[in-house]
Swiss-Prot record:
The gene is tada2b. Residues 65-118 form the SANT domain. Coiled coil: none annotated. The keyword Zinc-finger applies. This is Transcriptional adapter 2-beta. Residues 247-262, 367-377 have a biased composition (Gly residues). It comes from Danio rerio. Transcriptional coactivator.
């Protein structure tokens, strides 16, 4: 007699107690998986009817060839246990699955089926990528660990620590900035019966205190960055005196200390002094000292390195502006190449020297003229007149010798000439207006020839071939006309 507790397929009468497919529209239609997959139809049942899977929990998930005979209900208990207890806790997992399974069986079954089996090969990749994201902020960011890292203690002696009231282990001072800041929170206490307005007020006090602490730490960092503590203790002056004393030992002479306060720089002046200094600093001008004093309040908004770079860039800007003005002065004087600037500077130096000698001679001439008059009165008219006349002639000759452009400097157009053009006109004994006329005609004819316009040069009659040749050579050397035109 058939077992009443078993279920059979209505098509092939196979035992479907463990797993069967039940039709959702027909009554008492239960098929085995094989008949359902083949599309079996019995009576009013059709293969497109809805269905549901009925699991008795006693069939094997991995098939009859799997070792151990694990049922689907045990597999579900195993997955629930590993999710609850975690991988490796095999004793608790075995107790959760059932008393029939030992911890070793549970471990072997899970490793062989879920890790080394087909399911593990399909789900676990061969190379696991690194999905760990670094959420730490860069150095100096809002959440950077460097913000909470304490600064190293100051390198000062015990006497200096007592003088400053500095506590190196705490990196604090006996008298801090805003010493009364702790009074904001010293009397705060949170009670369970506080109202919302009281809680918000206490939070505001804490926020005010935190801001004061940040300002205190910011000022400490500024003092560290700009070395204000050594400057307060006078160490910078001692270092300057030591470096100055070290700079005196050498052939090149003593070194000079330039600047005041923490911005002072020591400039060694000699071969030995320059070799001892690793990075010699530039001299600080009086103008830059004034700018540093005016901008001292802005030091708190930038590091010392950026502050020094700012003044270095300003110094470079001044140097470039001076160089541009010098080049513009060369161009106004007709110099178009740098190799001509040395000759021009030498001539200018000589000219200034002659002017200086001329002024000295004029002052001497005035004093000697007065002396001659006295001598004439004391020694007689003839002798006085002779002395006075001789002095006047020698003075006129000296003045004519010192004056470089005395022949043309009072003529019209003299101020329109460059220094080289003045020398040229003076050497050719040519008036400035005549030279400017010839220069204009030559440049105009040269431009017309370059544009292909036929032109006939009509130079003035007072210009001979020698003067014309010299002027053409001068204009070509100065870059007014091309060399082939000369």
């Amino acid at each position: 007699m058939a077992d009443l507790g078993k279920k059979y397929c209505v098509n092939c009468l196979a035992d479907v107690t463990n797993l069967r497919i039940r039709c959702a529209e027909c009554q008492d239609i239960e098929l085995c998986p094989e008949c359902f997959s083949a599309g079996a139809e019995i009576g009013n049942h059709r293969r497109w009817h809805g269905y549901q899977q009925v699991d008795g929990g006693r069939f094997s998930l991995w098939g009859p060839e799997a070792e151990g005979g694990w049922t689907s209900r045990e597999e579900q208990s195993l997955l629930d246990a590993i999710e609850q207890y975690g991988f490796g806790n095999w004793e608790d997992m075995a107790a959760h699955v059932g008393a029939s399974r030992t911890p070793q069986e549970v471990m072997d079954h899970y490793v062989s089926m879920y890790i080394h089996g087909n399911l593990g090969k399909a789900c676990i990749p061969d190379s696991i990528p690194n999905r760990v994201t670094d959420h730490t902020c860069p150095s100096g960011g809002p959440l950077s660990p460097s913000l909470t890292t304490p600064l190293p203690p100051l390198d000062i002696t015990v006497v200096e620590q007592q003088q400053l009231g500095y506590m190196p282990l705490r990196d604090d001072y006996e008298i801090e900035y805003d010493q009364e800041a702790e009074k904001l929170i010293s009397g705060l206490s949170v009670n369970y019966d506080d109202e919302d307005i009281e809680i918000e007020m206490k939070r505001a006090h804490v926020d005010m205190y935190v801001r004061k602490l940040r300002e205190r730490q910011r000022r400490k960092n500024i003092a560290r960055d700009y070395n204000l503590v050594p400057a307060f203790l006078g160490r910078d002056k001692k270092d300057k005196e030591r470096e100055r004393a070290g700079g005196t030992v050498g052939v090149g002479g003593p070194g000079g200390a330039v600047g005041s306060g923490s911005g002072a720089t020591v400039v060694p002046a000699g071969p030995l002094g320059s070799s001892t200094a690793a990075t010699p600093k530039r001299k600080i001008t009086k103008e830059e000292k004034g700018q540093r004093t005016k901008l001292r309040a802005l030091c708190q908004f930038m590091p010392q390195r950026e502050f020094e770079e700012f003044f270095d860039n300003m110094h470079k800007e001044r140097m470039l502006r001076a160089k541009v003005r010098e080049l513009q002065r060369y161009r106004r004087n007709g110099i178009t190449r740098l190799d001509e600037s040395a000759e021009y500077e030498a001539a200018r130096h000589k000219r200034e020297k002659r002017k200086e000698n001329k002024s000295i001679a004029g002052s001497k001439r005035g004093s000697s003229g007065g002396g001659g008059g006295t001598a004439g009165l004391g020694g007689g008219v003839g002798a006085g007149g002779g002395l006075g006349g001789g002095g006047g002639v020698s003075t006129i000759k000296e003045e004519g010798k010192d004056s470089e452009f005395s022949a043309i400097e009072n003529l019209s157009g003299f101020e329109l000439l460059s220094d080289r053009e003045k020398v040229l006109c003076n050497s050719m004994n040519l008036s400035p207006m005549r030279y400017l006329t010839v220069k204009t005609i030559i440049i105009k004819d040269h431009l017309q020839k370059r544009q292909g316009i036929p032109s006939k040069s009509r130079l003035p009659s007072y210009l001979d071939k020698v003067l014309k040749k010299r002027i053409l050579n001068f204009l070509s050397e100065s870059g007014w006309i091309s060399r082939d035109a000369s």
